[in-house]
Amino acid sequence: MSSTATQLATTESTSNWWWDYASMKAPNRDELYYLKFSLLAVAWFLALNLIIHLVAMRKTSIYREMDNKKRTEYRAYIVSPIHAIGAVILSTLAMFFICGDGKTVFNNDECMNTVRYVHIWALLHTCGYFIVDFFFLYFVVKGDSTLDYQTYAHHIIATTTYYQTLYFFDGLCVFGCILLFIEISNPFTCLRWLLYTHGM
């Protein structure tokens, strides 16, 4: 094999590592993995909040003039669509592409009933988002309106449901991942709020 062919083979094998891992059948009830990935997701969303805060403080006077509660809400309207885009991408991959050979969750029972790592990532990515968002809304914003209580309930019920789904570990994991596709409308709602806030 020539050196070019060897380099190409090496590049191909290393470029597909993520896809190979995502499509691998996940082990049943790997609680330590769930904990590690949950902590990683929480750290990611906390870091994202920090980055948005630092950038917004430097780039927009509207954000600088807000009090801490409004800044938290402002960041939530940026973090939320970032989470939603990630959730929709993972959900789409899980529905249509991860099983390979033209198999989808809609035309193949094995694809629908086999929990893969991509399903776990999608669920725990969302749990990490809900945990961080709940923390900021409850402890920083301290909202006490009907909508705030509805949001608290939504976050607690969704997080609990996704962790229970992982505990029971069956087709519900796949179904939970599919349901994340409904996040597709989220960026538009958040964009509307941001445009209104900036007077556009």
Q: Residues of each region from the PLM?
A:
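Membrane-helix and juxtamembrane interface regions of eukaryotic multi-pass membrane proteins
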Residues: S2-F181, N186-T189, W193-M200
